[in-house]
Design a protein with these regions (language model features):
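Acidic, low-complexity intrinsically disordered segments
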Residues: 32-87
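Short, extreme N-terminal segment that most often corresponds to the first beta-strand
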Residues: 1-19
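Short, flexible N-terminal segments of the mature chain
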Residues: 14-42
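Generic structural motif
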Residues: 11, 23, 84-86
């Protein structure tokens, strides 16, 4: 099973969090993109992956999307995603 945890932070307080489970046979990359799309589905556009996000995610299976990753203004400091379980 693949699980990705998404958290929205503002002023060092977690505003919202969501864990996405994926049991599909997709590649790890597809699972990450699908989970991120699901986290952003309700009220947020999908962030743009910058080089710093890609590098952090490769190294730590975790990254933070700040205002520069979004086209529209966001009402929080950053969106953090982290892989918490992988097969």
């Amino acid at each position: 099973m693949f699980r990705l945890w998404g958290k929205m932070w503002k002023d060092n307080h977690m505003l919202k969090d969501l864990v996405i489970d994926d049991d599909s046979e997709d590649t790890r990359t597809h699972k990450i993109f699908h989970a991120l799309q699901e986290i952003c589905y309700d009220d947020l556009e999908n962030p743009i992956w910058l080089e710093s996000n890609i590098s952090d995610f490769k190294r730590h299976s975790k990254t933070r999307f700040r205002q520069d990753s979004f086209i529209e203004h966001i009402e929080f400091d950053y969106l953090e995603i982290q892989v918490i379980e992988e097969d």
